[in-house]
């Protein structure tokens, strides 16, 4: 068996660009960059942790009661707060992995790592597996403040889907194992929950059918 080759350092490519609308209604350009890049992953760690600290401070200032603070925290998806993006970049740097970072306003507010190929559970053909995908804390639903940007998870998954079809020659569709609080997002995308394919941590398996993946890919 041939050992997977390492990603080429510096082989970054801007694959998509567009415009986001802030909560303030201001328009902000964004770009999605494909490629393995330790710097981008480290930026996610540093800037996102600063964002979490700022959010926790905001919660304490907005609500002095600790019980209500806990209720506010429970409204936020924090299950991935321990993720180490730099460590993931070190661990997942061979050719079967593809990295995507979304940049807006000089910061990376979304990141995604996919693995390929992966056999579909819903039909014939190979698709890709979403190893990790997340958005920055200031773009998550929270009871005490508006998200800066909305829809970044869908935007970066759409870009990954387009890349997979065009460059990797995979058929439309992707799958993943979802963190519990993220299941609602994937259900909203109309992904299918497939029983019996849970992972070692009992996380549910979801897959986007080919027809719906094509619609996602073709959406503006």
Question: What would you call each of these model-derived segments?
Answer:
Residues 1-147, 155, 162-174, 181, ...:
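Non-catalytic substrate-recognition and accessory regions of acyl/acetyltransferase enzymes
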């Amino acid at each position: 068996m041939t050992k997977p080759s390492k990603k080429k350092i510096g082989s970054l490519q801007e694959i998509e660009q567009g415009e986001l609308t802030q909560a303030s209604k201001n328009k902000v350009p964004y770009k999605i960059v494909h490629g393995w890049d330790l710097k981008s992953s480290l930026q996610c760690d540093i800037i996102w942790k600063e964002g979490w600290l700022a959010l926790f401070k905001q919660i304490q200032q907005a609500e002095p009661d600790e019980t209500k603070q806990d209720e506010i925290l429970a409204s936020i998806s924090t299950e991935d707060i321990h993720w180490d993006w730099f460590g993931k970049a070190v661990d997942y740097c061979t050719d079967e992995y593809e990295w995507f970072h979304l940049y807006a306003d000089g910061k990376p507010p979304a990141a995604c790592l996919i693995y390929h190929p992966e056999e579909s559970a819903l039909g014939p053909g190979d698709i890709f597996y979403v190893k990790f995908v997340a958005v920055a804390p200031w773009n998550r639903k929270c009871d005490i403040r508006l998200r800066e940007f909305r829809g970044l998870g869908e935007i970066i998954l759409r870009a990954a889907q387009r890349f997979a079809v065009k460059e990797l020659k995979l058929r439309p569709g992707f799958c993943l194992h979802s963190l519990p609080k993220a299941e609602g997002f994937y259900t909203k995308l109309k992904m299918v929950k497939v029983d019996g394919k849970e992972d070692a941590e009992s996380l549910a398996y979801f897959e986007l059918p080919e027809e719906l993946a094509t619609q996602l890919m073709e959406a503006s």
